Amino acid sequence: MRHYTGIDRLINSFDQALRSLVPGTTAAQRSNPAEQTQAPLTVSDARHVAGLMRVNHSGEVCAQALYHGQALTAKLPNVRLEMEQAAIEEQDHLAWCEDRLKELDSVPSLLNPVWYSLSFGMGAIAGIAGDKYSLGFVAETERQVSSHLQDHLKQLPTHDERSKRILEQMNQDELHHRDTALNAGGVELPVAVKITMTAISKLMTKTSYYI
C-alpha cells in the first residue's frame, strides 16, 4: 500500500476542492433515486424547489470540505479512512443535487467557494483538536444537515416526487454517517461550538437559496 506524504495529501486536497466546486466534475457511484419518476412543476414551484436544491447542494459542498479538512489532519489512520469514505458517499449527494438543478434550469450557488473554504478550515481544526472531537464534529454536522433536509421535504410541492426521493435518500445517508461517527468514538461538542455551527449554517441556507 502506498504511503502518502503531507505533500501528497495537500495535492489531493486541492484536487478534491476542484471536483467539489466545478460543476460536472463529480459523478455519482449510485443510481439517482429520482430515476423513473416525473415531477411537472409550475414556474413558481420550480423556482422554489431550485432554491431548496441549491441550498442542499451547498450543504453537500460544505460536507465535502469538512471531510477533506478532517482527513488532512486526522491523527489515526482508521479515522482518516472514515473521513475519506464518508466524503466519497457524499459525492453522490453532490451529483444528485447538481442533476436536479440542471433539470430545473438552475445553477449551484456562486458562494460555494466561500462555504468550502470555511468548512475545510473548520474540519482541519477539528482534526487537529483530536479524533474524538473530529468525529463529534461530523456527528453534529450530519445532525444539522438531516434537520435541514427534513424541513425541505416538508416544503416540497406534494407532486415533486423527483426531489423528494433524492432528499429522502440523502437524509438516510446523513443519519447513517452521524451514527457511524458516534459509534467510532465521537463526543458531544461544547454548546458554544454548536451555536457557532448553527449560525454559519443559517447564513449559508439563507444566502444560497437566492445566490
UniProtKB/Swiss-Prot annotation:
Entry coiled-coil feature ranges: none
Cofactor(s) the protein needs: Fe cation
Membrane topology listed for this record: Peripheral membrane protein
Matching Gene3D superfamilies: 1.20.1260.10
Pfam families: COQ7 (PF03232)
The organism's place on the tree of life at top rank: Bacteria
Record field: catalytic activity: a 5-methoxy-2-methyl-3-(all-trans-polyprenyl)benzene-1,4-diol + AH2 + O2 = a 3-demethylubiquinol + A + H2O
Main location: membrane
Function: Catalyzes the hydroxylation of 2-nonaprenyl-3-methyl-6-methoxy-1,4-benzoquinol during ubiquinone biosynthesis.
EC numbers: 1.14.99.60
GO CC terms: plasma membrane
Full protein name: 3-demethoxyubiquinol 3-hydroxylase
Gene: coq7
Any one GO biological process: ubiquinone biosynthetic process
Keyword Protease appears in the UniProt entry: no
Annotated binding of Fe cation 1, by residue: 60, 90, 93, 174
Compartment(s): Cell membrane
Any one GO MF annotation of this record: metal ion binding
Pathway membership, UniProt: Cofactor biosynthesis; ubiquinone biosynthesis
